[in-house]
């Protein structure tokens, strides 16, 4: 399919961008997804992440973290979920750890300056927050401007954060670090939280500069615009920015974080609340897509990427560890 100029991003997003998203299967560890979807997910076209389901023995021994809930079924949660006790509030609801490094890019005092070959995205394949900037980086053609380094769990993940086990000598090839947390400590010696992904690292200073996954893709879209090729799609157009920001602010608690609210919570009350909220929000999302090919009309935007990385995992991964599934994504005709 021939790609048109930036003035007509619909063709780019329908062809070049879709092919680029398909190539992300290699990056995100995904397998081929059925191609019969005709709705929004079918248009975005990508894969779905697979993760381990607890064995029957683990369930019998209570190692899946299950508890009774009014919806029936079982929450087949992973063992590591139980380790996030610092993120559980008094009534058992999951409250996500605040981002530690939120210094923005921009011209204001203290703002980070966009530079080529200065920053690297440190990410994990199974983390949907990580997949966002990696997908956007490639859609915008920033592969030669911002590096990317994958991290992975290790035996010391709880103490030191993710490691670089897939690289020679178990070291980050760009900085020589052994653990992601080293960048956090170098930026703030008093940091005591969890080193999370994605993290934007200043590879020259070897320190974390931003782990604000809420805004990281926007910085790539706007502040790194001078480094993008002329035919790169505009994922954050000025005329829609206010609406995109408002939509993303709704999307995060209700859809993106909805899975984690169900999976990580420690009380049936918190689970039921998250369950109802998630499916009510899916209904709203499906309704929105009745008249739109994508979330903001004919063009893929930042919001589509954010919704995609969550919903594409649901039917083949997330539902395994959140309990009963009220309705699979494939039954939402406009989303699917």
Outline where the language-model segments fall.
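N-terminal regions that are enriched for targeting/export leaders
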Residues: 62-117
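GST-like fold's C-terminal all-alpha helical module
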Residues: 192-195, 203-204, 208-336
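Local sequence-structure signature of Cys/Sec-based thiol-disulfide redox active-site neighborhoods
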Residues: 106-159
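Structural micro-motif
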Residues: 161-201
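Intrinsic disorder/low-complexity segments enriched in small, polar and charged residues
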Residues: 3-7, 13-15, 19, 24-30, ...
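Short, flexible loop/turn elements at secondary-structure junctions
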Residues: 123-129, 152-155, 184, 201-205, ...
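Short, strongly patterned local motifs
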Residues: 40-47
């Amino acid at each position: 399919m021939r790609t048109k100029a930036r003035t007509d991003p619909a063709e780019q997003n329908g062809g070049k961008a879709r092919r680029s998203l398909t190539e992300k299967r290699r990056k995100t560890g995904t397998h081929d997804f059925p191609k019969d979807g005709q709705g929004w997910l079918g248009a975005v076209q990508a894969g779905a992440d697979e993760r381990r389901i607890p064995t029957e023995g683990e369930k019998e021994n209570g190692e899946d973290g299950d508890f009774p809930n009014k919806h029936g079924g079982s929450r087949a949660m992973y063992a590591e979920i139980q380790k996030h006790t610092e993120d559980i509030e008094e009534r058992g609801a999951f409250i996500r750890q605040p981002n530690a490094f939120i210094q923005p890019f921009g011209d204001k005092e203290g703002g980070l300056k966009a530079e080529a070959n200065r920053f690297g995205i440190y990410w994990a394949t199974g983390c949907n927050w990580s997949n966002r900037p990696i997908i956007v980086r490639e859609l915008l053609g920033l592969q030669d401007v911002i590096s990317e380094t994958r991290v992975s769990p290790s035996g010391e993940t709880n103490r030191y954060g993710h490691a670089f086990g897939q690289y020679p000598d178990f070291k980050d090839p760009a900085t020589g670090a052994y653990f992601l947390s080293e960048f956090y400590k170098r930026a703030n010696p008093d940091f005591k939280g969890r080193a999370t992904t994605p993290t934007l690292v200043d590879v020259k200073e070897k320190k974390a500069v931003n782990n604000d996954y809420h805004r990281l893709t926007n910085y790539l879209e706007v502040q790194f615009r001078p480094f993008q090729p002329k035919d790169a799609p505009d994922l954050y157009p000025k005329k829609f920015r206010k609406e995109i920001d408002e939509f993303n602010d709704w999307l995060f608690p209700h859809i993106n974080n909805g899975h984690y609210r169900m999976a990580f919570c420690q009380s049936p009350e918190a689970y039921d609340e998250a369950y109802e909220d998630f499916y009510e929000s899916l209904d709203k999302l499906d309704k929105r897509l009745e008249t739109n090919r994508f979330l903001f009309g004919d063009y893929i935007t930042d919001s589509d990427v954010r919704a995609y990385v969550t919903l594409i995992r649901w039917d083949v991964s997330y539902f395994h560890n959140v309990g009963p599934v009220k309705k699979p994504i494939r039954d939402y005709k406009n989303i699917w």
